[in-house]
Amino acid sequence: MAIQTSNLGYPRIGLQREWKKTLEAFWSNKINEEQFLTTMKEIRLQHVKVQQEKGIELIPIGDFTYYDHVLDTAYMLGFIPSRFSEFTSYLDVYFAMARGSKDHVASEMTKWFNTNYHYIVPEYEEGLQISLKDNRPLRLYEEAKQELGVDGKPVILGPYTFLKLAKGYTQEQFATILKQLVAPYVQLLSELHAAGAQIIQVDEPIFASLTKEEVQQAKEIYEAIRKEVPNATLLLQTYFDSVEENYEEIITFPVSSIGLDFVHGKEGNLNAVSKYGFPADKTLAVGCIDGRNIWRADLDEVLTLFTTLQKQVQTKDLIVQPSCSLLHTPIDKTEETHLSTELFDALAFANQKLEELVLIHSALTQGTESISNELETYRNVHHTIRSSAARNREDVKAARTALKEEDFSRPLPFEKRYELQQVALKLPLLPTTTIGSFPQTTEVRQTRKEWRNGIISNEQYEQFIEKETEKWIRYQEEIGLDVLVHGEFERTDMVEYFGERLAGFSFTKNGWVQSYGSRCVKPPVIYGDVAFINGMTIKETVYAQSLTEKVVKGMLTGPVTILNWSFVRNDIPRKEVSYQIALALRHEIELLESSGIRVIQVDEPALREGMPLKEKDWDAYITWAVQSFLLATSSVANETQIHTHMCYSNFEDIVDAIRALDADVISIETSRSHGEFIDTLKHTTYEKGIGLGVYDIHSPRVPSKDEMYKIVEQSLQVCDPKYFWINPDCGLKTRRTEEVIPALEHMVQAAKDARSLLKTNA
């Protein structure tokens, strides 16, 4: 049996974020197109070289991109919306689709399955000419071969996943458009095969959540492609979950190899292999190293997995690979020497994961004795962090054990609470507020940097934050907002800020991952038991409240969002980590309330995106996610108003969960898809406080009062005015002051006009 090492995809951003810097330099005209292309080629080839040096045999080619791999596929297949027709050059069209321009709205962006990466949504239009516009995978395959002598493994997004992720067609059109994709995919694969590609990876992550009818439809497309390209060696790659429900059919697809995720879909895929075996004439590609987290693998567990598989399958060959692309992990841990030894040793970023694949390959081909020293090291590392004081806090254990049913619910139902809150807060009909943050100007960022570098003292920094807070409290009063915020000038990031103030978190210096386009994030590492230390938001919020007679909201990030936007320890269930965060936040909320703060917002923008891919697994996730929010927020008095904020994503999927959160008011980011959301509310009632974003904060445009009034008017057709709030769709941190003030003035005027109309019609 031949066994090879393979990688599914490598991080794009560069060890020092060279990729990001090159992109942004090009966008700001600091480098020209030739310099941009030359630098990008250097980065791309360097990534191939690293994987070659690490000992990976099947090196992915074509996973590199200038923005997003789904956008690459859309451009390649001619899915270019007509509004971009005036652009002529490849890069102009490509980046206009990704980012928009002064006169062109960008294509929509959304989360890549249940990860924290975002892709550009392909758009189908009537009359679209689907064809192979550009065989980019072929160019990159030939480049690696000529420049480095690497016979790589081209990686392409499969036709079924691509079209399922696209928008702009009706369900009735889907089958017809899918058939139109056969010809360009045939041409793409034929040209790759003719150029010498030994194996071509076709990614179909959507296969983890298809119906039986959809799998059959996908199979017919692959049969049509295979008929035209009979000799190409295709690896059908699935990831992010198991394909258990459709495994029996998927293993009959006309492909040479099938890749399965034995990390996030381990139980389901093992069950399926045990029940149905695996075809002897196909290669099984085993996703055995977690491509979505940063922890060293348990090599003993991985080798046990292979022992199990080798007993159950008769396949001629095996491939050892990560569970998914390493796009979701930082590149290399070597710079993280500031971390404690026990934590540093327990980490494995992308380059370390490649080394783990090679170790497993050695054990499988030469016996475990060939890596006996490494196995012993790994066992010691796991034992050290498992038994560390950080992971075994008695106070955290005791708090969890002491939880009772009443800790997860408010004393009174919403209607009665809301009445008490109206009396206590004295807010008008259709109250106005913002989501939390105000512009983080160059001065704000520079002052924070000087403070962190020790150039200015704590006292000087605090005085600066107070000055900014007072300035924006006055702005809000002048604008006429009803519920104010302190502005969050002390915060760099809504998760990092809290992680820095809670026990159990650590932070990397260079642990960057791509979020979307050139935007990179550095997720906190939850490595130990999470616990409250000291007040995190009290000082700034209480100071802001002291400046005004109006109500000031406390602002916190919710437990599920902190969890979903961090790298999370993998030795206990995510539910338990979420409860630990919730208990810490509960303490903070109680402190805010006892300090006189009567409205407290606990944001959960990432609640939906943490949901499992399979609908059958949703209930279990939603149950503990909702319980986490309730645990954090349920100890306050009935008169204290709890708000939450969410980013809109398939509201219908989670409307029951949103109700169960029992927040007094929810604000939802809907400005880009307001019509869809209004339609949803026509047949899905929501009977609690709700604010639908009345303008898009992601655009520098200042919308008119009339535009916002129209949205309020539409919203009031499906929302009870008694419970309706008026707000922007998200925080205003990234906007400029000269954009924010007029936009909020228009919003307040729209609210006043709406109140007048309601009074007239009463």
Curated annotation (Swiss-Prot):
Single GO BP term: methylation
Co-factor(s): Zn(2+)
Keyword Endoplasmic reticulum set for record: no
Enzyme class: transferase
Binding site for 5-methyltetrahydropteroyltri-L-glutamate: 17-20, 111, 519-520, 565, 609
Catalytic machinery residues: 698
Keyword entries, A-Z: Amino-acid biosynthesis, Metal-binding, Methionine biosynthesis, Methyltransferase, Repeat, Transferase, Zinc
Disulphides: none
Parts of the chain that traverse the membrane: none
Binding positions for L-methionine per the UniProt entry: 435-437, 488, 603
Cofactor annotation remark: Binds 1 zinc ion per subunit.
Listed InterPro entries: Cbl-indep_Met_Synth_N, Cobalamin-indep_Met_synthase, Met_Synth_C/arc, UROD/MetE-like_sf
Pathway: Amino-acid biosynthesis; L-methionine biosynthesis via de novo pathway; L-methionine from L-homocysteine (MetE route): step 1/1
Catalyzed reactions per annotation: 5-methyltetrahydropteroyltri-L-glutamate + L-homocysteine = tetrahydropteroyltri-L-glutamate + L-methionine
HAMAP family: Meth_synth (MF_00172)
Function statement: Catalyzes the transfer of a methyl group from 5-methyltetrahydrofolate to homocysteine resulting in methionine formation.
NCBIfam families listed in its UniProt record: met_syn_B12ind (TIGR01371), PRK05222.1 (NF003556)
Protein's recorded name: 5-methyltetrahydropteroyltriglutamate--homocysteine methyltransferase
Annotated source species: Bacillus anthracis (strain CDC 684 / NRRL 3495)
Lineage per the UniProt record: Bacteria, Bacillati, Bacillota, Bacilli, Bacillales
Gene name for this UniProt entry: metE
